[in-house]
Amino acid sequence: MVLKNAIALTGGIGTGKSTTIKILESQGYKILDADKIAHQLLQEHRFKIAQHFGSDILEKDILNRKKLGAIVFQDAHELKWLEDFLHPLIREHMLKKAYELEKNHQAYFLDIPLFFEVGGKKCYPVSKVVLVYASRALQIERLLERDKLKEAEILQRLACQMDIEQKRAMSDYIIDNSSSLKDLNKQVERFLKTLL
């Protein structure tokens, strides 16, 4: 079943996707957040995940995402294992909620950072794909400031995602977040007018 009212929102780390989501929410749009679902699933399945990665990733029976991240962002094989485990579960949850929202006959957004990496429209049959874009150099600059990560760590994480320019070429609409918050608001408004 095609999700006629669903719009996938994607981007890379540091492109401003979270800020864009806040703008959309302030306009009254419903958002299904793949990352929030992933965090819930990590906790629900923490013991199975710990069986694979070792009990060091648990603290008082709670999964420590930083410790898990330190493992998976340094080892492509381990990242693949985690993604192969989580992505089908995330997809199941997202689609179940999306089918419910379809009944409202109003546009809503699926916030999926790894939209293209997990199969794009084959996995999530949305009407449009919107990319929140910022150049790789700007992503790195923002992540250095925001997350206080070392540049090597940032480059490792970026390497785990499809290149932002590839995503740009595959998207139906681009929200360019290379400037100010005021400009981002204008870009979002411009996009929302295309939905009318």
Swiss-Prot record:
GO CC field: cytoplasm
Catalysed reactions listed for this entry: 3'-dephospho-CoA + ATP = ADP + CoA + H(+)
Compartment list: Cytoplasm
Enzyme class: transferase
GO terms (BP aspect): coenzyme A biosynthetic process
Signal sequence extent: none
Gene Ontology molecular function: any one: dephospho-CoA kinase activity
Record family assignment: Belongs to the CoaE family.
NCBIfam families, alphabetized: dephospho-CoA kinase
Role: Catalyzes the phosphorylation of the 3'-hydroxyl group of dephosphocoenzyme A to form coenzyme A.
Protein name: Dephospho-CoA kinase
